[in-house]
Amino acid sequence: MKNIKILSFLVGLAALFAACENNDNEGPVTPEPREQVGRTVLVYIVGDAGDSNELSDLFKINFSDMKAGMEEVDYSKCNLVVYSEMKNDLPHLISLKQKNGKVVADTLFTYAEQNPLDKEVMSKVIAQTVDYFPADSYGFVFLSHSSSWVSASNNANSRSIGYYRKTQMNIPDFREALFSAFPKPLKFILFDSCNMQSVEVAYELRDCAEYFIGSPTEIPGPGAPYKAVVPEMFTETNLAMNIAEAYYGYYEKLYTGVSPISNENWTGGIAT
């Protein structure tokens, strides 16, 4: 009997410590549609490249920075939803929301393994986001490798966005997914992905969004400084300029013009 009492005490103590653990990640939770707000932004992360171009580790840092950025917004007026596809993990749809004075990550859906660059998959994710997080306006952020319309000296036939296990998505398919699944043109698209700020891309997506924000060349490996960028995604006046300046300004402060640069110490600036 004495042994049983000791065991019961230890089990109870373990449960107490587990209950007191500070855990910023919740879920899966039973999703319930939220009341309509001013703006919902869907962040679409494609991290599993399947080769040496892997981006998942960098994107995990981006995700943490997004949580920090959400601390600076009025959650009653906005939603930040993240589709996360990373190496060695199943894809998830996650809501970053404020709860009890801090930002938590609620896992709404966990999917079976799927190609995030498939048109039907992307359309489904967008439709779920719209259904559960209706808003007056929408934004879309895309994180992955991309080639866009590259110069003829490289690959004249390349018109793609994203990179998942050596597969890519045709930009016309990307346009169709956005146009068919969102109920209205987006307020903005932020391409946190190389080479996507081109006339050809803007023309292809001309009926999908009001503003396009990106770089005509390569972007820094660490990507956008989301702690600064996320609050700007939910502004109204000078929206596109606010996002661009938050992105550019971060790297401008780090710029030294000295080589070499690295993802841990990116001092080479960013093209605009």
Predicted regions located by residue number:
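Bacterial Sec-dependent N-terminal signal peptides
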Residues: N3, L10-G38
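Terminal, contiguous helix-loop blocks that mediate binding/assembly
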Residues: D131, N155-F191, M196-T272
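Intrinsic disorder/low-complexity segments enriched in polar/small residues
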Residues: N3-I6, N265
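A short linear-motif detector with a strong N-terminal bias
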Residues: A15-C20, F59, K119, F191
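Intrinsically disordered, low-complexity regions
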Residues: M1, L13, S52-S56, T267
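Functionally engaged cysteine thiol sites
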Residues: C20, H145, C194-M196
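Divalent cation-coordinating acidic motifs and surrounding scaffolds
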Residues: N25-V141, S146, V150-L178
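Short secondary-structure capping/junction motifs at helix and strand boundaries
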Residues: A19, A135-Y138, K184-L186
